[in-house]
Amino acid sequence: MASHLRPPSPLLVRVYKSGPRVRRKLESYFQSSKSSGGGECTVSTQEHEAPGTFRVEFSERAAKERVLKKGEHQILVDEKPVPIFLVPTENSIKKNTRPQISSLTQSQAETPSGDMHQHEGHIPNAVDSCLQKIFLTVTADLNCNLFSKEQRAYITTLCPSIRKMEGHDGIEKVCGDFQDIERIHQFLSEQFLESEQKQQFSPSMTERKPLSQQERDSCISPSEPETKAEQKSNYFEVPLPYFEYFKYICPDKINSIEKRFGVNIEIQESSPNMVCLDFTSSRSGDLEAARESFASEFQKNTEPLKQECVSLADSKQANKFKQELNHQFTKLLIKEKGGELTLLGTQDDISAAKQKISEAFVKIPVKLFAANYMMNVIEVDSAHYKLLETELLQEISEIEKRYDICSKVSEKGQKTCILFESKDRQVDLSVHAYASFIDAFQHASCQLMREVLLLKSLGKERKHLHQTKFADDFRKRHPNVHFVLNQESMTLTGLPNHLAKAKQYVLKGGGMSSLAGKKLKEGHETPMDIDSDDSKAASPPLKGSVSSEASELDKKEKGICVICMDTISNKKVLPKCKHEFCAPCINKAMSYKPICPTCQTSYGIQKGNQPEGSMVFTVSRDSLPGYESFGTIVITYSMKAGIQTEEHPNPGKRYPGIQRTAYLPDNKEGRKVLKLLYRAFDQKLIFTVGYSRVLGVSDVITWNDIHHKTSRFGGPEMYGYPDPSYLKRVKEELKAKGIE
């Protein structure tokens, strides 16, 4: 092709990025009829026009018109969507700089009617579309001195989707998209010109000529009622999404208006994303009342509308999600296309629906990272585990249900290994399972008791206790109780319910005295001290010789560290609760979590690696299931994008910002939890940075191990209400971090 030949339909486009790679992506995009609607074309840079400007030259005019008709375009650059803005060429701008209706006295001869202009009729819409993207909303103050209250009131009929601000003298300010403001400006200009003409000319000269069909088709604002012999006609345009929503919410309203006022309403698409409603009636019909009725109903139902799009990770389930949401949100218009849901409705409904999608239907992965390591197995002393086994197996079963994981318990030498693995590939809550198990293990360890049975009073009967048969029988009958036998006493260690049965079994021979043990969590000199007061309550009064022997045992008995379950060495006493541990054991435990493993007393202020962001809340009158007498506290977290630090998994890498919403009942306990959450947020404990299995990407912001209710409904399995124990649980989670 000769270079001087110019393709018939050039088009300028603008993106926020530039360079050869972007040019190639644009060329590939506009050559794809499936992606853009375009066809054979070439793309060249136009940096002299403005940064990021490219010229697309289509071989066929039809390809260009298909691109313009589609309206919105975008390409992927570095796996991120980049919008494409369509800019008309210089010739197109010159053709369309003239107003659509130059004046009220415009003659039919002045109306463009050539074929070329008909072909280029989409270009103004492309301009409008581009402008609407630049100006999401435009606010205009009206000059009330120029127009009557009635003229200004007609604005809502002209543009039903406009938002108005009224004063004592009617509408004073309007707010809407750029196209609506243009319509209002044109209408008021016509009204002003009419009034000027009435003052300058006779009534016979001010009569308005009927608009030609072409003028009517190109006119944005509604025409004035046009009187004919048998019929009068009027129409206006509204945005297509808003009209679809209106028909969805009020399916019979159009028919009702037609019957009530004796009119006919013809509906057709007038331009991309716009709908024309043509009101016609016979002389007996009330056309103006019908228009006003429709405008009032339309504005009432569409004024608070917002529209948002949600892309789903699994496009096959998009239709299923749409059906589920349609059942729950009857006033939300939901459209599905190619795995993307378009939500049109009030902001509250959209927010609630997005939460359902993100937190319920598509489970959000929550992964916790401890400092510089990721837990994948727990090892405990096998002898210690045996003492707690029945209690821990129940807890493991609860953990499996709570976090949708499976567990595996195995012995390796003197150690018992506990492994948790997620059942769901898209959500991994195993770290929560490990944390819950550690808490349960420490709690159960604190319930262990030791009891010393003195054998002296048994005389010869105690010989059978030293036989192998007794030891084998005891271990078989009481596998969860550890016993140590010497010449003077038998020491039993286990949980209280197991210990009572084992003690009864040993004492069947009679005549054997007992010294009741104490719980490990009591704060005396050593965790395993013998409590003589409990001893007296548990058995008949002992003779002096027995008491003196117990005193000797007190002196010989050494403290046991509940972390390693061995004799305490290099003892360290915690200052608040006075519990004692091996110094290396407690130092290591404190490095993971600065709390006492025995009583959960906090030591020091925990600081997390939460990214920068904000936390705000509002109060809604709507109640939560289970808290019908109270309103709802709505918490909004807005976390900023940033760069990971040394505290995060991949220092130096960027992470995107997110917004999350959580709900609490607006009662005394809920407000208490709100204050605690604010403290946790200040200590950077609410969020962390990790890996999202749903998105398939790393380096994103995820929840930390303080659980939130991110849905109003659905119960615990949907992260919602009712959940009677939630507030208690979250306070315990906060307490474990030193926040109470």
UniProtKB/Swiss-Prot annotation:
It catalyses: S-ubiquitinyl-[E2 ubiquitin-conjugating enzyme]-L-cysteine + [acceptor protein]-L-lysine = [E2 ubiquitin-conjugating enzyme]-L-cysteine + N(6)-ubiquitinyl-[acceptor protein]-L-lysine. The modification N-acetylalanine is found at residue 2. GO terms for cellular component: cytoplasm; cytosol; early endosome membrane; lysosomal membrane; lysosome; nucleoplasm; nucleus; protein-containing complex. Keywords: Acetylation, Antiviral defense, Chromatin regulator, Cytoplasm, DNA damage, DNA repair, Endosome, Host-virus interaction, Immunity, Innate immunity, Lysosome, Membrane, Metal-binding, Nucleus, Phosphoprotein, Protein transport, Transferase, Transport, Ubl conjugation, Ubl conjugation pathway, Zinc, Zinc-finger. A zinc finger (RING-type) spans 561-600. Induction: Induced by IFNG. Induced by IFNB1. GO terms for molecular function: enzyme binding; enzyme inhibitor activity; histone binding; histone H4K91 ubiquitin ligase activity; histone ubiquitin ligase activity; protein ADP-ribosyltransferase-substrate adaptor activity; STAT family protein binding; ubiquitin protein ligase activity. Binding to PARP9 enhances DTX3L catalytic activity. It comes from the Eukaryota. The modification Phosphoserine is found at residues 9, 202, 221, 532, 539. The keyword Transport applies. Residues 96-119, 195-231, 524-551 are annotated as: Disordered. Its EC number is 2.3.2.27. Disulfide bonds: none annotated. Gene3D superfamilies: 3.30.390.130, 3.30.70.330, Zinc/RING finger domain, C3HC4 (zinc finger) (3.30.40.10). The keyword Transport applies. E3 ubiquitin-protein ligase which, in association with ADP-ribosyltransferase PARP9, plays a role in DNA damage repair and in interferon-mediated antiviral responses. Monoubiquitinates several histones, including histone H2A, H2B, H3 and H4. In response to DNA damage, mediates monoubiquitination of 'Lys-91' of histone H4 (H4K91ub1). The exact role of H4K91ub1 in DNA damage response is still unclear but it may function as a licensing signal for additional histone H4 post-translational modifications such as H4 'Lys-20' methylation (H4K20me). Belongs to the Deltex family. Homodimer and heterodimer. Can heterodimerize with DTX1, enhancing its ubiquitin ligase activity in vitro. Interacts (via N-terminus) with ADP ribosyltransferase PARP9/BAL1 (via PARP catalytic domain) forming a stable complex; the interaction is required to activate PARP9 but is dispensable for DTX3L catalytic activity. Forms a complex with STAT1 and PARP9 independently of IFNB1 or IFNG-mediated STAT1 'Tyr-701' phosphorylation. Found in a complex with PARP9, STAT1 and H2BC9. Found in a complex with E3 ligase ITCH and ESCRT-0 components HGS and STAM. This is E3 ubiquitin-protein ligase DTX3L. It comes from Homo sapiens. The lineage of its organism: Eukaryota, Metazoa, Chordata, Craniata, Vertebrata. The gene is DTX3L.
